[in-house]
Amino acid sequence: MSTMSESFATAGSLIVAADPNLLHIVALSLQVSLTAVFLAACLGLPIGAAVAVGRFPGRKPLTVILNGMMGLPPVVIGLLVYLLLSRAGPLGSFGLLFTPTAMVIAQVVLITPIIAALSRQIVADAWRDYEEQLRSLGASTPRAALTLLVDTRFSLSTAVLAGLGRAVAEVGAVMIVGGNIDGVTRVMTTSIALETSKGDLPLALALGFILISIVLILNALAHVVREWAVRRHG
């Protein structure tokens, strides 16, 4: 019991003292995840809007695929990206494996379907309400999709925040493609796994506290934005 209490006390001390190693790991985690979410949003939001508004052959199967890809196994994504970036892979000449860039790529592949599927549902709901008005104004499909993306931007922010929460908490894919290299590709989730296996509980607990806090803040922010959007736009 004393060992457990000492571990919690030391973890708190690391956070309060702003341990440099701790801060570096947290900063790298946020850098990788925020970059991945930005790129995934640039891809996922237009895809979701296009599927919601467009009428083309294969639209329903594509919707099913998008929804299904929300549950992609992270380790499988990590393995596929590893094969692409390895020396024997098609992108091996770029030397991206075991770098933060490889981790960003893995997270983009993982969270783009999440953002696309959630945004498709949000835009589809708005499309049912405004389709007649937009058609009467002569809006083309791309124009209608863009208009609805702008109109539902606050609701869409919850989809982006959901993607960010998924990215920050990811461990399997980033460990495979990043290699968990100290000072280079070691992020919060991979550090927690490593330090726990080594028996360094204080650092693992400190990172765990920070990770849980980030996830809770993101979920609370998503809830606040969603409620505010409902009150403002109905």
Model-derived features with residue positions:
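Membrane-interfacial helix termini and adjacent extracytoplasmic/periplasmic loops
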Residues: 6-13, 20, 77-108, 178-181
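Interhelical loop and adjacent transmembrane-helix boundary motif
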Residues: 15-21, 176-216, 220-221
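Hydrophobic positions within alpha-helical transmembrane segments of bacterial inner-membrane proteins
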Residues: 33, 37-49, 75, 79, ...
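C-terminal transmembrane helix and the adjacent membrane-cytosol boundary/short C-terminal tail
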Residues: 114-131, 135-138, 142-147, 205-234
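Transmembrane alpha-helices
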Residues: 118-119, 123, 141-173
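Alpha-helical transmembrane segments of multi-pass membrane proteins
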Residues: 27-35, 69, 142, 146-158, ...
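Periplasmic/extracellular loop-to-transmembrane helix junction in inner-membrane transport proteins
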Residues: 1-37, 53-59, 148, 197-202
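Transmembrane-helix boundary motif in ABC transporter permease subunits
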Residues: 35-66, 141, 148, 219-227
